[in-house]
Amino acid sequence: MFAKETYVQRRAALKKAVGRGVLLFLGNDEQGLNYEDNTFRYRQDSSFLYYFGLNFAGLNAVIDIDEDREIIFGDELSIDYIVWMGTQPTLHEKASAVGITETLPSAQLTEYLHRAIQQGRTVHYLPPYRPEHKLKLMDWLGLPPAHQEGSVPFIRAVVKQRNHKTAEEIAEIERACDITADMHIAATRFIRPGMYEYEVVAEMNHVAESHNCELSFATIATINGQTLHNHYHGNRIEEGQLFLIDAGAELPSGYCGDMSSTIPVSKTFTPRQRAVYEIQNAMHLESVKALRPGIPYMDVYDLSARVMVEGLKELGLVKGSAEDAVREGAHALFYPHGLGHMMGLDVHDMENLGEIWVGYDGQPKSTQFGRKSQRLAIPLEPGFVHTVEPGIYFIPELIDLWRGQGKFTDFINYDKVEEYRHFGGIRNEEDYLITENGARRLGKKIPLTPDEVEALR
C-alpha cells in the first residue's frame, strides 16, 4: 500500500475527470473453493485497490462527486471472526489509512444508492466480472445482468488514469519483473529430461513465494507450446523437446510481472529449433526497436508479423509478399495471438473494463483471425507499461483445418509445413515502459538469444 496521499490524489483526479454523479466501487468478497470456509486466495478488485488501497474482503465504496463525500461501506468484525482470524484494524482505521474519514455499515449502501437515484443523479459503476457483483447491481440499481455494461465516462476516466503509470507504480512493477525474471532463470537452469512439468512449476513457485509473492496468473509450463494457454503440468519432459514457460509474480501490492521463455530440454537447440527460434527472436528484437511514443501498437504487431513471414519464407514454409500475407491474415496460421497487452495491477491490465476501451480507445476491433487477439492497438504514450511477446506455433488442428479449406494457398506451403507438424511453439516475452523518447525494459534481463539460453543449460 502506498502513502495515503497517493490515494487522495488519485480520487481527486478521478472526480475531476468524471465531473458529476456517484461513483460506485465494488470490492471483492471471499470465494469458496469447494465449501464456504475453504476459500480461494483472496484478491481485491484492482480498481478498488488503485483508488482505495485496501486489500480486505467485504468492503464497497462510493465517491459522491455531487455531495463531495467519499465513503467506505463495511462492517466491523465479530468476535467469532477475530477468534479464528486474529486481530484486525477497525473499519475506521482501514479507511483513515487511505485518507477516508467517513465509513458506514454495509446495510446502508442500498439506501444511499436508492436515494441518489430518486434525486435524479447518475450512479456510475464499472463492468462487473463476478457473479455476486452482478447480483448486487441488480439489487442496488435494478439492472438485470444482461444490461450491466458499465458507465462509459467512468470507464474512460479510470482507463486514462491507470494506463499512465507513476514513478511509484513503475518501481513496484520493476520489482515484480525482477522476481519474474528470477523465476524464469531458475527454470531455465533447472529443466532436465525425465522430469515432469509440475517439477518445473514447483521450482518457479519456490522463487515467487520466497519473495512473498503470489502468481500473477496461472502458470503455463509445457512441452506443448503450440497450445497458447496450457495449464496442464502432468507431462514427462523428454530429450529433444522444447519447453515453453509463461509465468509472472504478483507483489503483495498487487502489481504484476509477465514473461515468457522457450528452452531446449536438451543442452542445445536442434538445428531446426534454432532456425525457428532465431526468427521469433528477430520478431521480438525488431518490435522492441520500434517502441516509442506515438507509434500505434498495431503497427508494431504488423511489423513483427512481417518479420516472421520473411523468416519463414527462408525455411520454405511460406511464399509471396510478406506485406500481402499479413494484410490477408495468412500469418495467423503460425502467429494466432497479439503482440502484447497493458500490464499493471492486472497482468492484462483493466481487461475487465473492456479491451475496446483499454487497448482501442473505443474504436472497433478487427474481426480477422489472429489480428482480433491483439489487445493493444492505440498509439503508445509515455507511462504505458506493456508486454512484447510475439510467437511462432505449429498447431496441428489449425493446419488441418486451413489446409482442408484451401485457405491462403498463395502464401502457405502446406507440404513443407507438414514437416513441422510436431514442432510445438516458441514464445519469448518481456515487459516495457514507454518513456519520453523510446522504451525501457522492466526487470532483470532474461536470456533471449539462442546462445544466451544455451549458456544457462
Residue spans for each PLM region:
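Active-site neighborhoods and metal-handling regions in enzymes and metal-associated proteins
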Residues: 1-457
